[in-house]
């Protein structure tokens, strides 16, 4: 069986590409829905996105242990998730924003797990996650 060099190169690139890829530029626009509750403020006080403080500051959320932003009072379930060693990835953020309650119930294996985030983002979670990752680079 003959495989062309082009086909082999394309296959290698597809296999090497990350399975998760959001668009940070689209995510920046989509984040307008999020700023109703969240802001993005750098440690030096620079307001990247001025938003409400109903939810935690999302600066540096990718890689952060869940439920640990010091200036926010989290619900018990998200604190328990963090206590288990869980740290946010872009993929997890994208899944979480689709259905925060279902995400916590699955991750904690607890049907009674509750979230403080009632909003569900049906589409664009990957883009928002990519945007959140990009603001700290």
Swiss-Prot record:
Keywords: Electron transport, Heme, Iron, Metal-binding, Photosynthesis, Signal, Transport. SUPFAM superfamilies: Cytochrome c (SSF46626). Gene3D superfamilies: Cytochrome c-like domain. Residues 1-21 form the signal peptide. The keyword Nucleus does not apply. Heme c binds at residues 34, 37-38, 117. InterPro entries: Cyt_c-like_dom, Cyt_c-like_dom_sf, Cyt_c_1A/1B. One of its GO terms (molecular function) is heme binding. The keyword Nucleotide-binding does not apply. One of its GO terms (biological process) is photosynthesis. Binds 1 heme c group covalently per subunit. Changing residue 108 to T: In strain: 2.3.1. Cytochrome c2 is found mainly in purple, non-sulfur, photosynthetic bacteria where it functions as the electron donor to the oxidized bacteriochlorophyll in the photophosphorylation pathway. However, it may also have a role in the respiratory chain and is found in some non-photosynthetic bacteria. PANTHER family: CYTOCHROME C (PTHR11961). Belongs to the cytochrome c family. This is Cytochrome c2.
